[in-house]
């Protein structure tokens, strides 16, 4: 290749000589100048076109292999981060909602069981308060009942109650004696029948059931009288009215009926106060005529029914709604006659 490059140079020199032969005659010689056409041989230098082998560098275009960097586009694998959305698993935090288990704290509510123990003791003084209210009401009732009641029957000796060897001659502490505040109390009873030797030898002071009528002396007993008094029957707590009648009249032992032999008097009356006073009047009158023979049972209506019914051993003997009206002297005699018949049957 270098040799060929050198050959054209002399030819060009020669051409220059021909140019110097500027004589017009020799000008046809320039026709030989086509020899320079041979200089086209350098066209062979087109072989350098092979130099586009640098174009072979176009394989370097493969260098866009860096364009393969978009292969990093798979980095949208970060788009998988939405899979991290499962972190809402912290939504399990509501599971601590069962922490309301502290609501079991109400279990201490059974502690009111301690409050149940005081009520058990409270009912003990309740009867004393109730009896105190009855005692306060008795003077008014006695003043109201005194004009309408007949004279008290003469007092009779108290019954003789033999005491068993196992019994305690002293009254039970749970039984309370209710004093009588009525101004109608009769004179002190006469001598009572003697008791059995065991009861006669029992030490201790005797109790008197008679009390003064002075309201200021309510709850205070008179000085004891040295006379034997029968002990109360255990298991029975009579009402205030019945105890008052017992203090006023002492029935004989023959009239002391057992509870199963007593005549049941059931009175159903209206809830008004006037009806309850009429019931007390009737009860006191019958107890004075039949001491220790009657067992009273009252049924007071909660409303004002205007009813006043008297049953003797389940038999209706008086009814206000049926036209009998209130119990007057004639109606009272009818009830007394029915009770006499029942006592004779027993």
Swiss-Prot record:
Q: In which tissues is it expressed?
A: Testis specific.
For bias kind Pro residues, which ranges apply? 151-162
Q: At what sequence positions does the UniProt record place the cross-link Cysteinyl-selenocysteine (Cys-Sec)? A: 270-273
One Pfam annotation reads Rdx
Instruction: Please give the InterPro entries that the UniProt record associates with this protein.
Output: Selenoprotein_Rdx-typ, SelW_related, Thioredoxin-like_sf
Q: Which UniProt keywords apply?
A: Redox-active center, Selenocysteine, Ubl conjugation
The membrane spanning regions, by residue number, are none
Q: Where is this region: Disordered?
A: 1-40, 151-206
Is-annotated flag, keyword Protein biosynthesis?
Answer: no
The role this protein plays is: May be involved in a redox-related process.
This chain's protein is named Selenoprotein V
Task: Name the source organism.
Answer: Homo sapiens
């Amino acid at each position: 290749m270098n040799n060929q490059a050198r050959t054209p140079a002399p030819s060009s020199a020669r051409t220059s000589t021909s140019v110097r032969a500027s004589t017009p005659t020799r000008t046809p010689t320039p026709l030989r100048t086509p020899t320079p056409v041979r200089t086209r041989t350098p066209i062979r230098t087109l072989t350098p076109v092979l130099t586009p082998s640098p174009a072979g560098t176009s394989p370097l275009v493969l260098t866009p292999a860096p364009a393969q960097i978009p292969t990093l586009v798979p980095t949208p694998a970060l788009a998988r981060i939405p899979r991290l959305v499962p972190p809402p698993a912290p939504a399990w935090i509501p599971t601590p909602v069962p922490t309301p288990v502290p609501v079991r704290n109400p279990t201490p509510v059974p502690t009111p069981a301690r409050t149940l123990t005081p009520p058990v003791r409270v009912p003990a003084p309740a009867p004393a308060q109730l009896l105190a209210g009855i005692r306060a009401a008795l003077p008014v009732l006695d003043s109201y009942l005194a004009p309408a009641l007949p004279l008290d029957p003469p007092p009779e000796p108290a019954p003789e109650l033999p005491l068993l060897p196992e019994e305690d001659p002293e009254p039970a502490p749970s039984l309370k004696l209710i004093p009588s505040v009525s101004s109608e109390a009769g004179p002190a009873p006469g001598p009572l029948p003697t008791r059995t030797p065991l009861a006669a030898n029992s030490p201790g002071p005797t109790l008197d059931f008679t009390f003064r009528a002075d309201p200021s002396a309510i709850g205070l007993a008179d000085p004891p009288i040295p006379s034997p008094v029968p002990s109360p029957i255990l298991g029975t707590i009579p009402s205030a009215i019945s105890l008052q009648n017992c203090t006023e009249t002492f029935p004989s032992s023959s009239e002391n009926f057992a509870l199963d032999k007593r005549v049941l008097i059931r009175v159903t009356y209206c809830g008004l106060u006037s009806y309850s006073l009429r019931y007390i009047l009737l009860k006191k009158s019958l107890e004075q005529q039949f001491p220790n023979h009657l067992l009273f049972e009252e049924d007071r209506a909660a409303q004002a029914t205007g009813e006043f019914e008297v049953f003797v051993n389940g038999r209706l003997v008086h009814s206000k709604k049926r036209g009998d009206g209130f119990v007057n002297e004639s109606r009272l005699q009818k009830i007394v006659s029915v009770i006499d018949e029942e006592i004779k049957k027993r």
